[in-house]
Amino acid sequence: MFCASSSPITSPLYPKAYKFSQTKSNSKRFSSLRASLPVSDNKLLKFEYTPWLIVGLGNPGLKYYGTRHNIGFEMIDHIARATDISMNTIQSKALVGIGSVGEVPILLVKPQGYMNFSGESVGPLAAYYQIPLRHILMIYDDMGLSNGVLRLQPKGGHSQHNGLKNVTEHLNGCRGYPRLSIGIGNPPGNMDMKAFLLQKFSPLERKQMDEGLEQGVEGVKTLVEEGFSDSISRFNLGQKYKFHKV
């Protein structure tokens, strides 16, 4: 089921329906979000900009650091560095950083429950900050794409990804939220899928992935400022063919 982005969204933990309001008088939480930004940025921000909730999926703890299944966390770290956002707040079982891309407020999120319970952070945060479905960007690992290849989409299914499944459940079954898929390739031979997901990258894979993450930062910044414009179409096309030799 795809839910219209203009419809109110509810969360099982925050059952009251909500709809993001762009007026100052009706958005106290957005006011506090804006106030938490650096003073120099506050002078530039305008209330017509709807904030983005940008969530990277992964598992907490050093055991999972640098593994394929945690690439969503790595993408959030790259975005945080590029935008000078400190991931220094704990809210709704998640590590949260608040800042902006240009004039657009963003919240960077790394759920600290395990992957399969990511929705327990996403649902409450979306409800609390009144983020519309179309501005909830999920970042996750995708075995359907080659290692280091990225793709931005306005909506889609869960692709058998348990983290996405749980997020969708906590957004009332609505799948119409944007997502950034980060390719990690497929397990070689008869390798167990779980073992593959929890394995670290080879040196070549790591190089490809690091380049992809840097490109992903630019893709996310473009999405936040322009939406799903022609620039995103060009981004996806460039990603699709970047390893093809002419």
From Swiss-Prot:
GO CC term, one of those recorded: ribonucleoprotein complex
Binding-site residues, tRNA: Y64, Y114, N116, N162
Transit peptide boundaries: 1-34
InterPro entries to which the protein is assigned, alphabetical: Pept_tRNA_hydro, Pept_tRNA_hydro_CS, Pept_tRNA_hydro_sf
Catalytic-site annotation from UniProt: H69
Record site feature (Stabilizes the basic form of H active site to accept a proton), residues: D141
SUPFAM superfamilies: Peptidyl-tRNA hydrolase-like
Keywords from the named record: Chloroplast, mRNA processing, mRNA splicing, Plastid, Ribonucleoprotein, RNA-binding, Transit peptide, tRNA-binding
Assembly description: Part of large ribonucleo-protein complexes that include group IIB introns and either CAF1 or CAF2.
Matching Gene3D superfamilies: Peptidyl-tRNA hydrolase (3.40.50.1470)
Location in the cell: Plastid, Chloroplast stroma
GO biological process: mRNA processing; RNA splicing
Organism: Arabidopsis thaliana (Mouse-ear cress)
Protein name: Chloroplastic group IIB intron splicing facilitator CRS2-A, chloroplastic
Similarity field: Belongs to the PTH family. CRS2 subfamily.
Role description: Required for the splicing of group IIB introns in chloroplasts.
One GO MF term: peptidyl-tRNA hydrolase activity
Source species, domain of life: Eukaryota
